[in-house]
Amino acid sequence: MIEVLCNDRLGKKVRVKCMPDDTVGDFKKLVAAQTGTDPRRIVLKKWHSVFKDNITLADYEIHDGMSLEMYYS
């Protein structure tokens, strides 16, 4: 189990516990449950890379303690 930090740059930071083999879409559902946002509106980025919903966190090399940028569409 890993813990990933999501920051929306508007003052909201969320720590989410998940498995490395979870897809980004599953991870968005966990983030949405904590923030009260629709998971379809959440866009996760690291630098300028936008993460696709069907790829796993391990494939994107997201590890324990890593921070992701969260945007709303």
Swiss-Prot record:
Keyword Iron on entry: no
Main localisation: nucleus
Disulfide bonds: none
Keywords of the record: Cytoplasm, mRNA processing, mRNA splicing, Nucleus, Ubl conjugation pathway
Subcellular locations according to the entry: Nucleus; Cytoplasm
Pfam families for the chain: ubiquitin
GO biological process, one term: mRNA splicing, via spliceosome
Segments forming domain Ubiquitin-like: 1-73
Any single Gene Ontology cellular-component annotation: cytosol
InterPro entries xref list: Hub1/Ubl5 (IPR039732), Ubiquitin-like_dom (IPR000626), Ubiquitin-like_domsf (IPR029071)
GO molecular function, one term: protein tag activity
Keyword Nucleus: yes
Stated role: Forms a conjugate with snu66 and facilitates its localization to the nucleus. Involved in morphogenesis. Required for efficient splicing of pre-mRNA.
Subunit structure as annotated in this protein's UniProt entry: Interacts with snu66.
PANTHER family given in the database record: UBIQUITIN-LIKE PROTEIN 5
Protein name, per record: Ubiquitin-like modifier hub1
Source lineage: Eukaryota, Fungi, Dikarya, Ascomycota, Taphrinomycotina
Record gene name: hub1
